[in-house]
């Protein structure tokens, strides 16, 4: 068989890295970074470098949606359906819903992980064919505040900077972002810039001391929700010190005097009160941002990087505009190394913004409220008109479904039963909607449980089209292998449904086909034409040019290539060419803490996982860095609450409860709790006292949203934390064949609701095998039939199985050992009742140590093994599988300064030599070794 290499793009974050996909015999065998792609120049993070493992046929057969499925009853089993029958069913249901209830009774919820061409046809289907604006995207949850902020100040939704600016900046102002974990390849470029220019100043604004903050020269640990207070305080300092650029303000902006008066309230004392930032730190941040240094003339450039910490707030738009004001006030825009640079969360959130797939936008950044814009789009699409009334944004869409206004929900490439806030509301909506369609590549998301119709879509490695990254760079996405089963491209599914619906709608039946496309290129050509004369004009590009290399927009007809930076001439995308100073209002979070809910929950990402884990969660090695769901608290709070590491605690907000193990960390203020946004009920489950299934971390978050952007405040909620008294536990681990492990996990997921608390995660490495871990707890012993079922699912039975049961004390244990030469290895273990022995059994099993001398001890309670065991310790480097024990052992022999010791670690163990995501942790370990020496 011949191996081939296909150029494509990574499907994870908005950095937009280029990848080279090696395939052989219809199987993806390896993924490498594309050295010619300007976003990453060959680098990949831990997630991108393991993409080929997500495409393993053994995995795909277990987790993918491979054929259309239909439920005759919502609670029943989904049964296979032919494509024609599925399309006819959906087409008829849509037409009937429109005829009986109007077009606004159909709601479509799409995704920033769709390709631009998929996005375009979804948007045209809703606004052009059905005549409704009831379509929104999960990009509403991450980027709509950035959109609103850019439009309000600069006139267009267009990030003005580029990645190259990282190398030119004298100051980096990173706020509401943790690129070390969320945008790792951007962080590698930040590290490069710091090495090349040791004088580069890095300011990080984040309530937590993250890996990004570890690199900072100044960490501003502001209180959640106080961003505008900080930026106004900085602007006031700049005014007082004469650091603003009055010439730039006079020549290129409007509204300065009113804003200058408004920020006078943000005194250093007020900023300290609201943000917790000392006056000296505030002044330092203002000076560095302004680029004014004592003893030198001119102004050094400042680049700001920001993400969900700004956007996911009830003041999200104000956070964005207040930050952009700092750039405008100092002329820090439109030149190398300067500008407000929004880091996009998803791989094609930018593409969705470009095609107008938001409930209040139209194609090519057109405004729904502008009659001329609506007429332009209607003419392009060949329809009489597009509706003027904005549709319902993401949370509103599900509120309307819960209220019975929306009868049919079509959900594509996203998992709202995990990712939307206030999960109790979301699940009411999914239950009440009369017909729910889930179009997805994966069958494992929580939303799929509510679907009446499931449509199998293609995903990374199988798709053709384009995506746009954070720096406005359009990349080609290419298929390396054929789609598995009966999966279809998203654009094809929409087009086929549209061809069935159009003849059934009286206002559209007489028109020529609105969806005559035969492939993504034809769709892209129509999208390109929609951009003519707009701020994102790409009429100078062709599909062939994109095939040759990624291109930035704008690139209007007549230009040879796109523009790296915007507003270099000081003219902005407003009618008069002047940027706008608006009046953002300083505020606080939607839910301040109080006596009843005294803790501030902060959510965020993990280093090696992505979104709802549908893709990244199938890679066993990506679980090593964070092996199970936890809630992190400050050590003093854990002591005060009587919590030890690993204890279970109830986290309760006004909307719901999550039960999770707790873990102490040093990077949080007292009164704050951090929990990763990845933990949905697919991996973190259990049931309430009434038997209701717990819904993961977003059971806690609030649907309160920014009034301008309608983006919800997913970053913060007021909660209380109470120690859980669940004395009877279950702990199970087992190695399983790759071809079975994901089906086993899905079976265990169905059993988790039998416990008040349960979690189910993967462990292992591709070269050593894959396994499952189940952890659960209850008030009292469960029926032994349930334990037998767990053991059966994990293969802990038959030859080599050892068992112990004490029904009176509620103790139950089972182990299975397999002969491996002269040794015996532990294939699987279930502990029930007293589970303290997991402390030594887990490394025994996961590190494949000889268990033969411990056969009898496996069935005994206790935290200590009868013989001394050594453990690899916690994983540090996911790429090379290097853990703490090896690192600390080598550090004892290392010599020299911190940089030399870090290099010796890299040379000796290869940790930190691949994606680099573990380097901040390695640096902390090096520093600790120097301190203790």
What is the role of each PLM region?
Residues 352-353, 358, 518-617:
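Long, low-complexity segments enriched in small/aliphatic residues
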Residues 179-188, 415-425, 465-468:
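Glycine/threonine-rich flexible loop motifs
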Residues 1-241, 251, 270, 278, ...:
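N-terminal export/assembly segments and adjacent metallocofactor-ligating motifs
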Residues 722-933:
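Rossmann-like nucleotide/phosphate-binding core characteristic of flavoprotein oxidoreductases
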Residues 163, 461-483, 496-498, 702-703:
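Glycine/threonine-rich phosphate-binding loop and adjacent beta-strand/alpha-helix elements that clamp
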Residues 484, 490-549, 616-631, 636-798, ...:
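Long, contiguous, secondary-structure-rich segments that constitute the structural scaffold
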Residues 208-211, 441-478:
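Flexible glycine/proline-rich, aromatic-decorated loop/lid segments
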Residues 289-399, 549, 558-561, 570-580:
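A glycine-rich, hydrophobic/aromatic-adjacent loop/helix-cap motif
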């Amino acid at each position: 068989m011949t191996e081939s290499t296909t150029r494509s793009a990574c499907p994870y974050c908005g950095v937009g890295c280029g990848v080279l996909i090696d395939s052989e015999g219809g199987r993806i065998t390896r993924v490498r970074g594309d050295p010619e792609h300007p976003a990453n120049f060959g680098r990949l993070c831990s997630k991108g470098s393991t993409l080929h493992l997500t495409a393993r046929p053994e995995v795909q057969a277990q987790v993918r949606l491979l054929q259309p499925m239909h439920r005759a009853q919502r609670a029943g089993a989904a049964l296979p359906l032919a494509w024609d029958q599925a399309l006819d069913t959906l087409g008829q249901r849509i037409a009937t819903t429109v005829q009986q209830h109007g077009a606004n009774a159909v709601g479509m919820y799409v995704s920033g992980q769709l390709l631009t061409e998929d996005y375009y046809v979804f948007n045209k289907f809703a606004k052009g064919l059905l005549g409704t604006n009831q379509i929104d995207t999960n990009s509403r949850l991450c980027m709509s505040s950035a959109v609103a902020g850019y439009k309000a100040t600069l006139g267009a939704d267009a990030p003005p900077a580029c990645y190259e600016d990282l190398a030119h900046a004298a100051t980096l102002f990173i706020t509401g972002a943790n690129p070390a974990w969320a945008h790792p390849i951007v962080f590698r470029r930040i590290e490069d810039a710091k090495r090349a220019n040791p004088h580069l100043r890095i300011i990080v604004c984040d309530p937590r001391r993250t890996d990004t903050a570890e690199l900072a020269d100044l960490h501003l640990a502001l209180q959640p929700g106080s961003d505008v207070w900080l930026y106004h305080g900085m602007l006031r300092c700049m005014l007082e010190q004469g650091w603003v650029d009055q010439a730039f303000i006079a020549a290129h902006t409007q509204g300065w005097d009113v804003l200058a008066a408004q920020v006078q309230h943000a005194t250093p004392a007020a900023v300290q009160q609201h943000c917790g930032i000392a006056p000296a730190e505030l002044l330092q941040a203002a000076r560095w941002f302004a680029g004014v240094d004592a003893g030198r003339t001119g102004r050094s450039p400042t680049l700001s990087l920001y993400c969900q910490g700004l956007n996911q707030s009830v003041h999200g738009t104000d956070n964005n505009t207040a930050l952009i004001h700092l750039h405008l006030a100092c002329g820090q825009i439109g030149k190398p190394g300067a500008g407000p640079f929004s880091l996009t969360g998803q791989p094609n959130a930018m593409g969705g913004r470009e095609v107008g797939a938001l409930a209040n936008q139209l194609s090519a950044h057109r405004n729904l409220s502008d009659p001329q814009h609506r007429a332009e789009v209607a003419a392009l699409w060949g329809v009489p008109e597009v509706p003027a009334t904005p549709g319902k944004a993401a949370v509103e869409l599900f509120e309307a479904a819960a209220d019975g206004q929306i009868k049919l929900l079509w959900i594509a490439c996203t998992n709202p039963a995990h990712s939307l806030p206030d999960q109790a509301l979301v699940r009411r909506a999914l239950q009440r909607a009369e017909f729910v369609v889930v179009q997805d590549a994966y069958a494992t998301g929580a939303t799929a449980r509510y679907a009446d119709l499931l449509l199998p879509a293609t995903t990374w490695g199988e798709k053709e089209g384009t995506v746009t990254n954070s720096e406005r760079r359009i990349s080609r996405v290419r298929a390396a292998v054929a789609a598995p089963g009966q999966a279809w491209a998203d654009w094809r599914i929409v087009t086929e449904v549209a061809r069935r619906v159009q003849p059934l709608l009286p206002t559209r039946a007489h028109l020529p086909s609105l969806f005559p496309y035969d492939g993504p290129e034809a769709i892209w050509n129509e999208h390109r034409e929609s951009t003519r004369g707009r701020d994102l004009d790409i009429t100078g590009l062709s599909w062939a040019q994109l095939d040759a290399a990624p291109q930035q927009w704008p690139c209007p007809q007549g230009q040879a290539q796109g523009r790296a930076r915007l507003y270099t001439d000081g003219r902005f995308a407003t009618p008069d060419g002047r940027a706008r100073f608006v009046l953002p209002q300083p505020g606080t979070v939607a839910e301040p803490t109080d006596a009843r809910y005294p803790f501030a929950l902060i959510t965020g990402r993990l280093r090696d996982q992505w979104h709802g884990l549908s893709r990244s969660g199938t890679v066993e090695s990506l679980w090593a860095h964070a092996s199970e769901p936890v809630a992190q608290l400050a050590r003093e709070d854990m002591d005060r609450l009587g919590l030890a590491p690993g204890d279970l605690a109830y986290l309760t907000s006004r909307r719901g409860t999550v039960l999770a193990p707790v873990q102490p960390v040093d990077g949080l203020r007292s009164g704050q709790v951090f929990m990763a946004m990845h933990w949905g009920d697919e991996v973190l489950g259990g049931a309430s006292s009434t038997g209701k299934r717990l819904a993961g971390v977003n059971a806690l978050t609030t649907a309160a949203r920014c009034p301008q952007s309608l983006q919800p405040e997913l970053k913060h909620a007021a909660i209380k934390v109470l120690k859980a008294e669940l004395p009877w536990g279950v702990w199970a681990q087992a190695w399983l064949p790759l071809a079975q492990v994901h089906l086993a996990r899905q079976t265990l997921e169905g059993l988790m609701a039998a416990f008040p608390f349960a979690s189910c995660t993967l462990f292992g490495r591709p070269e050593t095998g894959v396994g499952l871990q189940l952890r659960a707890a209850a008030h009292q012993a469960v029926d032994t039939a349930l334990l037998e079922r767990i053991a059966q699912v994990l293969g802990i039975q038959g030859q080599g199985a050892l068992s112990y049961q004490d029904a009176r004390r509620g103790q139950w244990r089972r182990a299975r050992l397999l002969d491996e030469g002269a040794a015996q290895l532990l294939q699987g273990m279930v502990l029930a009742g007293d589970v303290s022995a997991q402390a030594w059994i887990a490394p025994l099993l996961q590190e494949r140590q000889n268990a033969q001398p411990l056969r009898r001890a496996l069935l005994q309670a206790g935290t200590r093994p009868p013989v001394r065991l050594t453990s690899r310790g916690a994983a540090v480097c996911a790429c090379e599988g290097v853990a703490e024990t090896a690192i600390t052992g080598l550090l004892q022999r290392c010599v020299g300064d911190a940089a030399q010791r870090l290099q010796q670690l890299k040379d000796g163990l290869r940790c930190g030599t691949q994606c680099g995501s573990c380097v901040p942790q390695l640096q902390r370990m090096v520093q600790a070794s120097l301190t203790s020496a």
